[in-house]
Amino acid sequence: MFIDKIKAKANNYEINVIIEIPMNSGPIKYEFDKESGAIFVDRFMQTTMSYPCNYGFIPHTLSNDGDPVDVLVVAHHPVVPGSVIKCRAVGVLMMEDESGLDEKIIAVPTSKLDITFDHIKELDDLCDMLKQRIVHFFEHYKDLEKGKWVKVTGWENKSKADALINEGIDRVS
């Protein structure tokens, strides 16, 4: 995959997300290598937990932690690693880990991909149980890894998500 050919935004309202980890997959953390285009196994998670959403990043962005902007894509199905999915941001999970701030944009597929998410405009439109599962996952997925920790500090709205995305794009430009 030639990541340099994939834009961060499909248009003013949609982002492109490269999936690294499918929802409900085994306890394996994958990472996309930008230079080779390969997906590497980053580590086998010591907890037997699976990601509650598809997990990936926005190409050509840089977040505060030095990595591309992270995105959780809410969907009804797992998406194959390496796939590019067009999404709309609806909010952000604010958290910190042993390395510092580590925000996660929450997004849904565009209407062209799945009309069942058309009514989701903000985080408040998502099911409360899904939001609880997301928090639970991130609060505990590193529990058995020595020296690692996560603290979820709250949720922010779509405006904050859009701001973080634009800041991430600006850091690369």
From Swiss-Prot:
Its cofactor is Mg(2+). Keywords: Cytoplasm, Hydrolase, Magnesium, Metal-binding. GO terms for cellular component: cytoplasm. PROSITE patterns: PPASE (PS00387). Substrate binds at residues 29, 43, 55, 141. The keyword Metal-binding applies. It catalyses: diphosphate + H2O = 2 phosphate + H(+). It holds the Pfam family Pyrophosphatase. The keyword Calcium does not apply. Mg(2+) 1 binds at residues 65, 70, 102. One of its GO terms (molecular function) is magnesium ion binding. Its EC number is 3.6.1.1. InterPro entries: Pyrophosphatase, Pyrophosphatase_sf. It is found in: Cytoplasm. Mg(2+) 2 binds at residue 70. GO terms for biological process: phosphate-containing compound metabolic process. Its main location: cytoplasm. Belongs to the PPase family. Homohexamer. HAMAP family: Inorganic_PPase. Catalyzes the hydrolysis of inorganic pyrophosphate (PPi) forming two phosphate ions. This is Inorganic pyrophosphatase. It comes from Rickettsia conorii (strain ATCC VR-613 / Malish 7).
